[in-house]
From Swiss-Prot:
PROSITE patterns named in the record: YIPPEE (PS51792)
PANTHER family, per the entry: PROTEIN YIPPEE-LIKE CG15309-RELATED
GO terms, molecular function: metal ion binding
Yippee domain span: 32-129
UniProt keyword Hydrolase present: no
The organism's place on the tree of life at top rank: Eukaryota
Positions annotated to bind Zn(2+): 36, 39, 92, 95
Name of the featured protein: Protein yippee-like F37A8.5
Keyword Zinc among UniProt keywords: yes
UniProt region (Disordered), positions on chain: 1-20
Organism: Caenorhabditis elegans
Amino acid sequence: MHFRMKVLENSSKHNTPKKQKTFQHYLPAGDRCYSCIHCRANLAAHAELISKSFQGSQGKAYLFNAVVNVGCGPAEERVLLTGLHAVADIYCEICKTTLGWKYEHAFESSQKYKEGKFIIELAHMVKDNGWDEQNDS
């Protein structure tokens, strides 16, 4: 028996990257969270907040354990207030605004707790869902 095979060529003649559709993640309604000040996309649940005692390039910043709707750029070494770290800028996946950075690696043992954590500057986020004036912690 003799079989014939037809080879299908890639219909695209150019190697242009395909656009990926961005799906927005919504945190549970009623749960306190932080959102992008520019487009109001949810960024982090209040339960993921580790510390309010951080300094970003544009002022006060918060450290979070986990974030949503955030993209990450390439890591680079930077000397920060607490020493040398490998960090990657993070940005809002919806409006593409740079929000802060992700700690990829800490070179000093006392700073290892930051690895894999995220800094978001207050200049780029607002409180959303379930906040009241009396309980603002």
